[in-house]
């Protein structure tokens, strides 16, 4: 009887040990799994990539988990990159310039083609303002340091005005829309899909979009640490972004139906915003570096950033193997 009891005890002990070993191995595997934290906004290709779920499947093969965090604008997203809450994200042209000026250790990874109609200066439907020149002395809402900041500067210059000729009111998109609806500001400089939403829901009138003034590239950026330690993951990410962009070109209806619920807007508004974007991500070209340098120099001259910047110093150069796969 004592022998049977001992045998049962040993069996139970070995079973417990095996279970503990399995749990420990599973925990170790979980601990070893890396995480790619992506910051996105209510526009652009990353929203589509999130909707499709192809990146998660691709990176799961490499033991990489993907986590997504939404931001209201580019400056806020780049602050997230700077403090280490995300590893990779998308912004317009101006936020990286302000981030570099503030000392953020970020790298430009890739860009989308120009999308100049995807941002605009809007006025209320009944506004007496008919031209950019008539903004002199007026209150203009914008998200400071965002892509539309440069659009406003260029539009004013083109109309013969200086930045000091208007009163900028710096507000994130939701607050800016509220101020626009209340009549607290005379104009609002904004990007899609907020732009399309204001046009469709408020019948806001476009005073000037980016056509002939700005490129309005989407830029993909990463922390220097993440890009340098994980070049293969970054390469896969750019490849997937490009693939989704190519898919969108021939599947606007499906893309719209996938994105609309994610951003909480109607299919009509979403489709217009999707149509206005540029698709076809590429690693950063010398021409794009030159264009970004011009933007940086403009903000330095306006004393909106404190020092001269060199854009080429913050461009990610993918390893040859990664570049060949693109």
Positions of predicted regions on the chain:
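Short, solvent-exposed loop/beta-turn-alpha elements that line the ligand-binding surface or hinge
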Residues: 56-64, 281-288, 311
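Pocket-lining segment of extracytoplasmic ligand-binding domains
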Residues: 94, 168-169, 173-261
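Secondary-structure end/capping motifs
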Residues: 228-304
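Short, glycine-/small- and polar/acidic-enriched structural segments
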Residues: 29-162, 169-170, 186-190, 212-214
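Small-molecule pocket liners
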Residues: 45-46, 115-121, 204-205, 216-220, ...
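Second-shell loop/turn segments in exported
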Residues: 45, 137-142, 185, 223-226, ...
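Conserved C-terminal helix/tail region of periplasmic/extracytoplasmic solute-binding proteins
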Residues: 297-326
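Short, low-complexity disordered leader/linker segments with a strong preference
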Residues: 1-34, 323-326
